[in-house]
């Protein structure tokens, strides 16, 4: 059995190679990958192709007959999802065994355009290989978005070259709470970790090869204790701050009148958008107490200068980069 694709279509070729690799992993047999002219198919093969008549851009049709298997999609994405369905039809451990598939046709398309999962690596850091395994599981379940939560009170996990202390200081905490939030019990074990920009780009590429978009999250203006520990001048009180060993919501947030804070946001976003080609960057915006802003003369001066009257308007200013 071979796997064929339309010659010259590198994405279909990549899909074919992915499927061949999985079959090798599950069975020990490596199906050869062959390019065919547009419109051609091979007997006793798994043929991958495009079909403009399939309505949904991510939809596919998988047909199994005695002469072979055909997987068509309107786009290469759809073909990839069809490959995942075929993959799930093969026993996970079928070394040396004959695999029989029932004849039939599967027509499938997603109900939702956005299908994603979130992973918080701030409270609990995960190594690069785990991130790849996580993405593989997303692909297996036809997910197309990986929401990567990279910054929080408990750790800053992405390298920002203009602000090296974010990882030198902000990626490390002295210990971690044991049990419920603020239980008062700690493990007294130093904890840390971060991803270099090159590692993040590696993850973006790995995800793209599986038709998954990586949306980074840089949480602001709250959940910034790790950043404030590295650069205390960006807070209302000037610190000292520490990377939090606890879970929960904390009063210390970015000072909205501090020009250094605003410049910091612009600089960080400039580097983040160079790493991640996603149309979106998640900026959190949740759980930002206004306690410090209410007592900070600089923040109050800006609130009055902007003519803000409601708390939601204050929060909006805190999220803007000026």
Set out the residue ranges of the language-model regions.
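A conserved hydrophobic secondary-structure block that centers on an alpha-helix together
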Residues: 120-153
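Active-site mouth loops of central-metabolism enzymes
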Residues: 116-130, 253-260
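Aromatic- and acidic-residue-enriched carbohydrate-binding clefts of CAZyme catalytic domains
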Residues: 110, 154-209, 224-263, 292-311
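Active-site beta-loop-alpha junctions enriched in small/polar residues
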Residues: 122, 151-155, 219-223, 286-288
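Conserved, mostly hydrophobic/aromatic
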Residues: 23, 75, 117, 138, ...
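Contiguous, structured surface segment used for ligand recognition
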Residues: 1-114
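Conserved small/polar residues in nucleotide/adenosyl-binding loops
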Residues: 315-321
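An active-site-proximal structural segment forming one wall of the substrate-binding cleft
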Residues: 141-146, 200-221, 252-284
């Amino acid at each position: 059995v071979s796997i064929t694709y339309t010659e010259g279509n590198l994405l279909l070729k990549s899909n074919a190679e992915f499927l061949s690799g999985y079959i090798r992993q599950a069975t020990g047999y490596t199906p050869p990958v062959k390019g065919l002219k547009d419109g051609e198919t091979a007997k006793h093969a798994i043929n991958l192709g495009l079909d403009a008549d399939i309505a949904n851009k991510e939809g596919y049709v998988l047909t199994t007959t005695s002469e072979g298997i055909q997987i068509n999609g309107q786009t290469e994405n759809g073909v990839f999802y069809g490959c995942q369905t075929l993959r799930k039809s093969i026993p996970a451990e079928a070394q040396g065994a004959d695999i029989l598939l029932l004849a039939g046709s599967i027509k499938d398309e997603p109900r939702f355009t956005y299908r994603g999962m979130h992973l918080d690596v701030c409270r609990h850091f995960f190594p690069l290989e785990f991130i790849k395994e996580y993405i593989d599981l997303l692909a297996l379940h036809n997910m197309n978005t990986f929401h990567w939560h990279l910054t929080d009170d408990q750790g800053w996990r992405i390298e920002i070259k203009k602000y090296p202390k974010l990882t030198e200081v902000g990626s490390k905490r002295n210990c971690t709470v044991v049990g419920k939030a603020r239980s008062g019990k700690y493990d007294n074990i130093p904890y840390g970790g971060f991803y270099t920009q090159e590692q993040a780009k590696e993850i973006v590429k790995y995800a793209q090869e599986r038709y998954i978009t990586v949306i980074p999250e840089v949480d602001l203006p709250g959940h910034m204790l790790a950043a404030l520990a590295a650069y205390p001048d960006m807070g209302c009180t000037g610190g000292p701050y520490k990377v939090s060993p606890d879970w929960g919501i904390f009063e210390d947030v970015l000072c909205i009148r501090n020009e250094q804070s605003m410049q910091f946001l612009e600089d960080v976003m400039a580097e983040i958008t160079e790493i991640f080609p996603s149309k979106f960057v998640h900026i959190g915006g949740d759980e930002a107490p206004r306690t410090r802003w209410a007592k900070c003369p600089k923040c109050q001066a800006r609130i009055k200068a902007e003519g803000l009257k409601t708390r939601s308007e204050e929060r909006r200013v805190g999220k803007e980069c000026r």
